[in-house]
């Protein structure tokens, strides 16, 4: 083995010396191949064991998947199994036993798109017919529908805004309807969408202003309550002052009457003792 290795190395060195610089990559690859061939037997045996184990795991998984039914491996596709169970129980279409074979009346649906999504149909676009995956032809009810034979973008544009809430109620304006019938330009739809968004923005602004008005009104109501309390206190004080004024008036009247009575007594006393007063005046003079 050692001789074989040395001979191989010498051969490779000679080969590299003989080859130009552009062929060095190929020589390196060949050296790698030679090294791979010279692996030990133990490493090869370990790799073989690992490969056998992997083969056993894969085969066991395949057998498990083949033996198990769709109900037992429902955890792999939960959504599909739930839909299949609903179809089997008839909870989605209670009036029909098989939804694949029978054709449904589209007049019961508020929107033709829901019915066309559940039944096979043919879409004619650019003079080409595209069959559904099931390969069935459309029924008479589908042919009588207004959406039959229209291109795909027609279904997208004619979806009812009720499916998406009231936010799209103002999207389909006159310009957008003209565009659907081929009379307008694509910019009309953009303008209608932006107009609806701006309209919603205005509603939001109005709501904010209403909230601000409510806050301001609450502040005003608080100020009004404070002023009313002050007025009540002032009224109470005024009533107390009025009571005091009335009492003072009564006291003044009593004092005035007493003063008049004292004045009368003094005058009567003077008149009674006028002779004595005259004598006293003469003595002083």
Swiss-Prot record:
| One example of a Gene Ontology biological process annotation | meiotic cell cycle
Tell me the keywords, alphabetical order: Cytoplasm, Meiosis
A cellular component term (GO) from this record?
A: cytoplasm
What compartments host this protein? Answer: Cytoplasm
Function summary:
Has a role in meiosis.
> What's the protein called, per UniProt?
Meiotically up-regulated gene 74 protein
